[in-house]
A protein has these predicted regions:
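Sec/Tat signal peptide C-region and signal peptidase I cleavage site
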Residues: 27-32
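Bacterial N-terminal signal peptides
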Residues: 14-25
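Segments that shape or occlude catalytic/ligand-binding pockets
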Residues: 129
């Protein structure tokens, strides 16, 4: 087992070195993204666009804040820091979640409102480096691409203005049931999906109602994904978590 793991790590280091020779950013997230993509699809996927697009309409400076530092009762289940995601392997080096400050303030207000109904927010993802968005695009095709952003335009996650989340029960600490699972690439993920248990749909709709009352809109095909209203004003970023001040 140790010999196999050593071989995997040697291959990954070699892959990262190749990526650097091709001019790919050396940030931790970018290196991990390149390593995963090249192991699975071949080194050609790292060619072409090698940095986030520039948006001339993004007039606000980035002001990313860490969510758990605002309120420790906000729970984290950062799926991309582990293997429980649609890729089946970690793409983040750290289990952390950030948003632009106004978006974080809106999220905190939603969290406090939900507490009155006995629920809290559990975060699956917030700000996402652009390199990871490119990885997701490179690793998907067909119907799956309905659920990932095109790196040519960047995603609202890259701007620090999108959050993936669910609710947990304040009494039990358990995650509430929803009509579909997080990152599930099926129609059960649609915010208006009519199937599943009525209780699960009611909780999904409660989450949407509260989030939308605090400056967010739900993504049309993902019940868990909410975009902050001023996302257009922020730049597309490719900053590693460890570099956020």
């Amino acid at each position: 087992m140790l010999e196999c793991w050593g071989a995997v790590m040697r291959r990954r280091v070699k892959t990262i070195l190749i990526a650097l020779c091709l001019g790919v950013s050396a940030s931790p997230e970018r290196a991990v993204a390149v390593a995963i993509a090249t192991e699975s699809r071949g080194v050609a996927v790292v060619r072409g666009q090698d940095g986030p697009p520039k948006d001339p309409n993004a007039t606000r400076a980035a002001d990313l804040v860490e969510l758990v530092k605002l309120d420790p009762t906000i729970k984290l289940d950062i799926r991309y820091a582990g293997a429980n995601n649609f890729l089946g392997k970690p793409v983040y080096k750290e289990a952390r979640a950030f948003l632009q400050r106004p978006a974080a303030d809106g999220l905190l207000a939603a969290h406090k409102e939900l507490a009155k109904a006995g629920y809290g927010l559990m975060i699956h993802d917030g700000y996402r480096p652009w390199a990871i968005t490119k990885l997701f695009w490179d690793m998907t095709s067909g119907f799956q691409r309905e659920f990932v952003a095109d790196p040519k335009t960047g995603s609202k996650h890259n701007r620090g203005c999108a959050v993936d989340l669910t609710m947990y029960d304040l009494g039990t600490g358990q995650v509430v049931e929803m009509p579909g699972g997080y990152d599930e690439m099926s129609r059960r993920s649609y915010p208006d999906y009519p199937g599943g248990p009525p209780e699960a749909r009611a909780k999904r709709d409660l989450l949407r109602k509260v989030m939308e009352s605090h400056g967010f809109t739900v993504e049309p095909n993902e019940w868990w994904h909410f975009n902050y209203q001023d996302w257009r004003l922020y730049p597309i970023l490719d900053i590693a978590f460890g570099e956020i001040k």
